[in-house]
Amino acid sequence: VADEAARVAFAKNIKKILEKNKLDGIDLDFEWAETEKEYEDYSLAILKMREVLGDKYVFSVSLHPVCYKISKEAIAAVDFISYQCYGPSPVRFPMEKYCSDIQMALAYGIPKEKLVAGVPFYGVTKDGSKKTEAYFSFVQDGLITGPAQNEVTYKGDVYVFDGQNNIRAKTRYAMDQQLKGM
């Protein structure tokens, strides 16, 4: 999406796929923009996508607390923004980090009416090696012993995750902040 021709071609191809398959929308999940140029290109791609799709389709983007700085115009162009408040680092899982990440997005200018807070249903290794495992695996192996549990040893590695109480608390926080959803 680094040039106008590529953005136009990409948006037109997406529209063809939506029409052909009778889909109602698209979510762009271009993660890990790092430079101002990458943010600018992503923002321009978002604007081009909305221009080509018009208002007929639901159009959202997925952002992450370490890479969320799309332009104000791009924010305005989407129907909602999924905000991935988790991983790949274990430091992203605690409630305090989740709350500060939400506040950071709101302070940046993402309207609460467009912000959908994401929570994980997987765990990451506590040692920072970034191995992941589905929460279902922990349940299936009988490792979940209660709703307050947020850590488990699985196949020799210690994983952190959001247990039931954390998911409940994060959902309550999103509701209290009047976000679009979870």
Task: Tell what function each PLM region has.
Residues T35-Y39, G128, Q178:
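Short, function-defining helix-loop hinge/capping sites that tune catalysis or transport
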Residues K20-L23, V52-Y57, A77, M104-K114, ...:
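A structural motif corresponding to the C-terminal end of an alpha-helix
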Residues V1-K97:
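Chitinase-like catalytic core of GlcNAc-active glycosidases
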Residues M49, K56-F59, Y86-P90, A117-G128, ...:
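Short flexible/disordered coil segments
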Residues L47-R50, V91-V124:
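P-loop/Walker A phosphate-binding loop and immediately adjacent motor/lid segment at beta-alpha junctions
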Residues K112-Y173:
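Glycan-binding loop/region signatures in secreted carbohydrate-active enzymes
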